[in-house]
Structure formats: structure tokens, C-alpha cells
Amino acid sequence: MIAHLRGTLLSKQPGQAIVECAGVGYDVAISVPTFTALPAEGAEVRLHIHTQVSEDAIALFGFLDREEKRLFERLITVSGVGPKLAIKMLSGLSPERTVAALRAQDHASLTRIPGVGKKLAERLVVELKDKLDDLIAAAPAAGPVAAGPAAEDVLSALLNLGYQRPAALKAIETAVEKDAAAGEDFDLLFRAALKLIR
């Protein structure tokens, strides 16, 4: 099993990175938080790897942060959560927000993630809420989960545009503080946050 890769980052895009090690290019699935934290293409990168072996394929899932990998591996222990859905979850909500939502039994935040319905959200909470003490500390209440339904989508959009997570979070929170209604409307919040982040 591959547990760690160190090599040259040949290419990156949301959801995927290709890392060359000793002349071999490894196709690695990644979350949005990992994508936004990767160095420039051509730089050396180190990834913690989870290897998933199936009958017809071997898939690699990579993480810059060891804690994110541990949370990913905890998520896939839940029935109905495969590696691809776990990556979507960590992209739709940051690892910190995922832990916070599970601990708070916040089904609404979990069901905003594509592929996570009400029953799966309930199962995630039941199976994991007491198994997170050794993982990432829950994020404070302020931020996208508390800022309104559009906040997570706007955060994801800003990260995909290349903005750093702390700056994006601050812009979203400031926009909602100025106009609470912005938290309910993606277009309104996105435009407001974009003006603030620039």
C-alpha cells in the first residue's frame, strides 16, 4: 500500500493532482482544501496517501494535512460513504466545519453536500459524533456554517478562484455582517465577498 508520496507536482486542478516520483506519475484524488494549499506546478510536494484497492482499479487519495487524512478515513467507515463521497464532503465543508457539524448534529450543513441526503447525514452523526475527540478541533461557530446557506458555496467558489481560505472566510463573514440577507443568496454574497477580498 502507498502511504506517502514525495515528488514533483506535475499538474493540479480541483479534485486531482499528478505527482511524479522516480519517473512515475501518480494520479491522486484530492479535496478542495488540499488543492488550494498545494504549491505551484513544478514544485516538490509531499502528500499523505490513502490507497483504495478494488477489483479493477487502485485509487490514490492525497492530503497535505495528516488530520484531514484521518478524518477522511473515519468518514469512509460509515456505510454509504465511499472515498469519492468523502472527498466531496471535505470539499463542500472544510475538515474543521465537517467535525463541527458532526459534533453539533448539524444535519442541515451536511445535507448541503451533493450526495449526502437526510438519512446519510443522520447516520454520519450517529456513527461519528462520539469518535472525533482525537481529530481536528471543531471550528468556532462563526463562519460559513453559521453565515447562511450560500456561504459554503461562495467559499468553494472563492477557493477555486485561487483565494486563500482565511481571506475568503473573512470576506464572507464581513459581507454577512454588513447585510444578513446576503447569506441567503449566492450571487449577492459572492459579489459582496469578491469586492471585499480584493
From Swiss-Prot:
Annotated spans, Domain III: 146-198
Task: List GO molecular-function terms, semicolon-separated.
Answer: ATP binding; four-way junction DNA binding; four-way junction helicase activity
Protein name, entry field: Holliday junction branch migration complex subunit RuvA
Annotated keywords: Cytoplasm, DNA damage, DNA recombination, DNA repair, DNA-binding
Which proteins does it associate with, and in what oligomeric form?
Homotetramer. Forms an RuvA(8)-RuvB(12)-Holliday junction (HJ) complex. HJ DNA is sandwiched between 2 RuvA tetramers; dsDNA enters through RuvA and exits via RuvB. An RuvB hexamer assembles on each DNA strand where it exits the tetramer. Each RuvB hexamer is contacted by two RuvA subunits (via domain III) on 2 adjacent RuvB subunits; this complex drives branch migration. In the full resolvosome a probable DNA-RuvA(4)-RuvB(12)-RuvC(2) complex forms which resolves the HJ.
A Gene Ontology biological process in which this protein takes part is: DNA repair
Task: Give the highest taxon in the source lineage.
Answer: Bacteria
Gene for this protein?
Answer: ruvA
